[in-house]
Design a protein with these regions (language model features):
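Alpha-helical adaptor scaffolds
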Residues: 40, 44, 49, 97-169
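"A position-specific structural signal for the A-helix of alpha-solenoid helical repeats
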Residues: 1, 35-38, 42, 81, ...
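Alpha-solenoid helical repeat scaffolds
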Residues: 16-19, 62-66, 80, 100, ...
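Register position in tetratricopeptide repeats
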Residues: 7, 88, 117, 121, ...
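TPR/TPR-like (Sel1-like) alpha-helical repeat modules
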Residues: 2-27, 96-109, 168-174, 182-209
């Protein structure tokens, strides 16, 4: 039944089944915990795309978030899912507040990356806060990418370039390549910009080639 719900994408039904799975110890504890996180994360996505009173589902998303226990609302994977849905719904300020609170409580690289994609009510404070995290996480490429993006939002072109180049020194990443390429193009360095765009595309190709593909069926 559990696999059937997964295959159908019926995450609310799977969530209702979780107590029984936990009681019967059908799955190892770690696997069950991961399944539970995925189910609740997918449920947040479903809630965000429901329509209520003619508006796409900010209210239903928030209701789904409140259904989680206080412990679950502190899990980085679920905070990430919630904040991403808030961002997609245009609730940028709310998304920034959720991420800021979570990152102050417990730093997480995935949350730090998303923090650079949201626009809070005070961009200068947002940048200052992220620079504070850099003291304890100086080699996190996701945080360096976020700092580059926050500097771009504040038109701090030189600092943005430094942070993006630092991110790429730690890890070659298509997102950082694209952001730095865009910046360099605006600064007139078209040759290096084109090189970075090409590198970013190559890195994306590597990710696609590494992804599993279905085995072709033979008639």
């Amino acid at each position: 039944m559990q696999r059937l719900h997964q295959q159908r994408g019926d995450w609310p039904a799977l969530i209702r089944l979780l107590p029984e799975l936990r009681k019967d110890k059908v799955l190892p504890a770690a696997e069950l915990a991961e399944l539970e996180r995925r189910a609740w994360g997918e449920n947040l996505s479903l809630a965000a795309h429901q329509e209520a009173d003619g508006t796409v589902g900010l209210q239903t998303l928030n209701r789904a978030w409140q259904q989680l226990s206080s412990a679950q609302r502190q899990e980085p994977q679920l905070v990430l899912a919630y904040a991403e849905q808030l961002r997609q719904l245009g609730a940028q300020v709310e998304a920034e507040e959720v991420l800021r609170t979570a990152l102050k409580r417990n730093y997480d690289s995935h949350l730090a990356r998303l923090y650079g994609l949201v626009r809070g009510s005070d961009p200068a404070r947002q940048l200052q806060l992220a620079e504070g995290w850099l003291k304890e996480h100086p080699a996190d490429p996701s945080l360096l990418l976020t700092l580059g993006r926050l500097c771009l939002q504040s038109s701090l072109w030189g600092k943005a370039r430094d942070y993006l180049e630092s991110s790429l020194r730690v890890q070659r990443n298509p997102e950082a390549c694209a952001e730095l390429a865009r910046l360099l193009a605006q600064m007139g360095d078209t040759e290096r910009s084109n090189q970075l765009f090409q590198e970013g595309l190559g890195l994306l190709d590597e990710r696609l080639l590494a992804a599993p593909l279905p085995v072709p069926s033979h008639a």
